[in-house]
Regions:
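N-terminal core-entry segment
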Residues: 1-137
């Protein structure tokens, strides 16, 4: 979340609002570090950029799972009114699934060797799993 206040992330938020025709404050998910809201997919994308903006990433899962899993999980948890326990469970599931997808694909080097960024290639599965858990799917 350290990058939430950077100009680069502010530019991402403005560009997405303009491209999607939404105004600042219109939506159900918070842009971290602001008082603005956006539709959940937009907020999750901008918040993911904020996580990664300062290169202070976590390690584990599919290398930097937090940049993908956390924005989706926190946004969905807010939307459904999840408890802290439900949120934490969903985050753990998200990291686990992202890692399993990476391992199933041959590991980090296998993804890197074909030009795929494992964070985005595997993290999306983890984000989807975390959101699905919170939605009780």
């Amino acid at each position: 979340m350290a990058g939430a206040g950077t100009e680069e992330v502010a530019q991402i938020r403005r560009a997405m609002s303009q491209a999607c025709g939404t105004s600042s404050g219109a939506g159900d998910a918070a842009y971290w570090g602001t008082h603005d809201y956006a539709p959940l997919p937009m907020a999750a994308l901008a918040n993911g950029a904020a996580v990664h903006a300062r290169e202070i990433d976590d390690f584990g899962g599919c290398a930097h799972s937090g940049a993908v899993v956390m924005p989706a999980a926190l946004g969905m948890a807010a939307r459904v009114g999840a408890s802290g326990r439900e949120l934490l469970t969903a985050i753990v599931i998200g990291y686990d699934i992202a890692r399993r997808v990476m391992d199933g694909g041959g590991g980090y080097q296998a993804f890197k060797s074909v030009g795929w960024h494992s964070t985005s290639a595997c993290g999306g599965f983890g984000a989807a799993a975390a959101a699905a858990k919170l939605m009780k799917l």
